[in-house]
Curated annotation (Swiss-Prot):
This is Replication-associated protein ORF4. It catalyses: ATP + (deoxyribonucleotide)n-3'-hydroxyl + 5'-phospho-(deoxyribonucleotide)m = (deoxyribonucleotide)n+m + AMP + diphosphate. Keywords: ATP-binding, Endonuclease, Hydrolase, Ligase, Nuclease, Nucleotide-binding. GO terms for molecular function: ATP binding; DNA ligase (ATP) activity; endonuclease activity. Plays an essential role in viral DNA replication. Binds the origin of replication and cleaves the dsDNA replicative form I (RFI) and becomes covalently bound to it via phosphotyrosine bond, generating the dsDNA replicative form II (RFII). In turn, viral DNA replication initiates at the 3'-OH of the cleavage site. After one round of rolling circle synthesis, protein ORF4 is linked to the newly synthesized ssDNA and joins the ends of the displaced strand to generate a circular single-stranded molecule ready to be packed into a virion. Disulfide bonds: none annotated. It comes from Chlamydia phage 1 (Bacteriophage Chp1). Its EC number is 3.1.21.-, 6.5.1.1. Belongs to the microviridae Rep protein family. The active site is at 251 (o-(5'-phospho-dna)-tyrosine intermediate), 255 (o-(5'-phospho-dna)-tyrosine intermediate).
Length: 399
């Protein structure tokens, strides 16, 4: 299903892009951007035909493309040399008697350090919790291997892929439901035996799956359940069934954090075949996100069980993509907004960049974020969120 955004939503999202990042990468990628400025009056426009950018050697190929897109969208914001002089973090040096070279830098997340990995796992946990809110039934399955099928004790993704296919067919045939998964494979802390944790969204085993109670836990005092029917579908060992509480969901979704101990990546000492594996269905939490999108954009946070979380990157990228494709915003005004605010640099550049943009309000009225945000809130009740008619037959109501 594709969704459409109205002018109120995009106006509030513009304010959302100004928020400072919730975390700080410990090993950011810092591109250096340089451009040539003619030495004339302070209000002369920079000759952007001579614009050029230099990157540090630690940039990877795919990250260079991201930086280039970000840099190419800041030209309008840095047009006037008078405002350029007001920014302390811009350095200037004479190139010759007629030109000066100005430069600035901004960090991009490395996506590999513990802070970046923690941010990604938290985003996935928030998405999984939102997906669970969209269903009446959810469950957690623990798939183990018996001694006959343990083999070399190396996780094989094909095992879980085939089981998911069998379970989808089983649930669709007997219950007529569509389900989603979030699965993490890991090795036990004591004996190192491989097993899988799986969250099933939209279904939980019932008496028809032949649930059998047994005593488990550290002291064998906890009542747990195993399913004989799911064991037949799994074929490699036992299948334990548990309730899908928020704690269980966050444990599975944020398991990736267990690999870091005092900033040390424990997976770096493992071969690729021995590393833990994680897989998830597409678009987790999407329906719940769009159902409460107005509320989330108004507070600029996602509130779950009293805790406030930032927007996962998946939702930010989706909103930016919808705005870029929607014909309603194919105007000169919104093209300018997309160019300045909805690009990669909108949420990658440091807070100093946005402080500098506020200095441009008198020169570029379109960048007056406060008035734009207040005007959007006044018309909040008159705006609706609806999908494209070509992609959805029914009415999608968010009220």
């Amino acid at each position: 299903m594709r969704y459409s955004l109205d002018s109120y939503l995009i106006s509030v999202y513009i304010r959302l892009t100004q928020r400072k990042s919730d975390y700080m990468c410990t090993n950011p990628i810092i591109p250096i951007v340089q451009y040539k400025v003619p030495v004339k009056s302070s209000l002369d426009v920079v000759d952007w035909s001579k614009f050029r950018s230099n990157f540090k050697a630690n940039l990877f190929f795919f990250e260079k493309n991201v930086v280039r897109r970000a840099v190419s969208n800041v030209d309008e914001a840095f047009r006037f040399t008078e405002q350029l002089k007001q920014v302390s973090y811009l350095s200037t040096f004479d190139l010759d008697g007629y030109h000066q070279v100005k430069q600035f830098s901004f960090p991009l997340p490395c996506r590999k350090c513990s802070e970046c990995l923690q941010k990604r796992s938290k985003d996935l946990a928030v998405q999984a919790t939102m997906e669970a809110r969209s269903h009446e039934e959810n469950s957690v399955l623990i798939l183990t291997y018996d001694n006959d099928h343990l083999g070399d004790n190396i996780l094989d993704y094909d095992h879980i892929r085939v089981f998911q296919k069998r379970l989808r067919r089983y649930v669709d045939y007997h219950y007529g439901k569509k389900i989603k998964f979030l699965t993490v494979g890991e090795y036990g802390d004591k004996k190192g035996r491989m097993h899988w944790h799986m969250i099933v969204f939209g279904w939980k085993p019932k008496s028809e799956e032949q649930l059998e109670p047994y005593l488990g836990g550290k002291y064998r005092t906890d009542v747990r359940y195993r399913s004989r029917k799911l064991k037949e579908l799994w074929k490699f060992g036992y299948v334990d069934v548990d309730e899908a509480t928020d704690g269980n969901i966050f444990y599975v979704a944020r398991y990736v954090q267990k690999k870091f101990v005092v900033g040390c990546d424990l997976d770096s000492s493992k071969s690729s075949s021995r590393r833990e594996k994680k897989t998830a269905s597409q678009a987790l939490g999407l329906d719940y996100f769009f159902s409460y999108l107005r509320q989330f954009l108004k507070t600029k946070r996602i509130v779950l069980n009293g805790f406030r979380y930032g927007f996962p990157r998946y939702f930010k990228d989706l909103l930016r993509k919808l705005v870029s494709e929607d014909s309603e915003f194919d105007t000169e005004y919104y093209n300018a907004l997309r160019k300045r605010l909805l690009s990669v640099c909108s949420y990658s550049m440091v807070n100093k960049y946005f402080t500098y943009l506020e200095c441009l309000v008198e020169v570029l009225p379109v960048l007056n974020f406060h008035d734009l945000y207040q005007r959007a809130l006044r018309y909040m009740d008159q705006s609706i969120l609806k999908p494209h008619a070509s992609d959805h037959d029914g009415e999608y109501n968010t009220t």
